[in-house]
Amino acid sequence: MKRVLIFLFAWTLVVFALQAQTEIDKAMFRAMYKFSYKTSPEQPTFDWVDWMYLDIGNKATMFYNRYAELKDSITNECLKQNIAPEAIHERTKNYPVRGDAPVYCQLYSEKTTRVATRYTKGYYYEEPMVMPQWILDNKSLTLYGYTCLRATTHYLGRTWEVYYTTEIPLSYGPWKLWGLPGLIVRATDADHYFLFELDHFKRLSKPELIIYIHREFGNKGGYTGSEYKKVSKKTFVEYERLFHKDVMAFLDFEMGDIIRSTSGDPAPATEIPYIPLEK
């Protein structure tokens, strides 16, 4: 049974691994954040860590899961070689991605935030870019080699404490946090469910494309699959909740069929506990 489920997950990875790409900007800078988080309020310590990239251009930023990007790249090369789904799973299992891996695009020229994710199908929503209402104070700390100042805000349902540095005069940060006089170096919520920490920052030696993925990979290769479906933010959040509540049931919903084991029984419920960043 375990082998069957591994195959199903691996095949799902193959189906949605490659998507159409559109250039939205060129990244001049890159910040890497360590994203530690709990998956249940009762946990005394963080349960998981994701490594996140923030690519920064002149008119847009993109915040994304580095391991998810690596898995896509490896899958791409494997598909070109007609490698079997189970073998692809073996090659990508060292890059664990917990749950879905949303990509956050801040389109400053359009004053729009675009959030996209994929299960077996792709979805996205857009919302106006609203800058957090920051309260600045004079508390100063040296964090990760930078002199930082403190700021707080109540934003998208949670109270955040952040430290930013004017040594990097870019008004960006992890997730949807932005609008300070310098790069956000550390951010945590009042409940201590989430912690973003700057691991390193660099100016890229040459500009790299910031790519927005919006089309599913075709059955025979190439970016010829269905366009990501635009949904309301409310629907997007509900899909995220349903996916984490029972992965298999959500895949049944998307595929219009019931995933079954070799015995013919429906695949057992598979829950991925999580706490949403917004509430």
Task: Show the residue positions of the predicted features.
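Bacterial Sec-dependent N-terminal signal peptides
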Residues: 1-26
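Structural motif
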Residues: 143-144, 155
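Extracellular or lumenal secretory-pathway regions
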Residues: 21-132, 137-140, 147, 161, ...
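Gly/Pro-enriched, hydrophobic low-complexity segments
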Residues: 150-213
